[in-house]
């Protein structure tokens, strides 16, 4: 199994039947990987900064506004020039936007296994060239660690403030995104770009 902490350029090509490891992928693929890493870092910096500012100056209920409105808006801002950016999780809060596809789910489950084996959560990532029904796609997934400030909305049920619980029950009646501990994998940033279209 390929190591998920990518210290050097490593591109995986995945099909329904086989997996190929290309240690020195084409320059375009290397560029995609570098650009995806930069986008994931910028996205999390912007989202985390906004969330931290709200948590320091207002009630924790305001953090829900960030996750519901600002996070999707940020993802839309970064989804341009052929790129698609979103957040996904095995325990999603927003069932319309946060549910992983088959590739994302498989890699998220792999992230969890690597986390349980002791690998640093904030270094877990995976890139691949995936053969999908509509063409070949460059895929990138970067784990999102659960930060201490996230626990007021994503922590143990008994530790979540009552006001937050009330809003969550109203806005997300099918919410699964609770019972996390600091350092666990909350989800991932998923970035993709189509390379070619199937004929």
Predicted regions span which residues?
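Bacterial N-terminal signal peptides that target proteins for export
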Residues: 1-9
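Detector for the c-type heme attachment site
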Residues: 151-158
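Extracytoplasmic c-type cytochrome modules immediately beyond a signal peptide or single-pass transmembrane anchor
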Residues: 23-147, 159-199
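N-terminal signal peptide c-region/cleavage motif recognized by signal peptidases
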Residues: 16-18
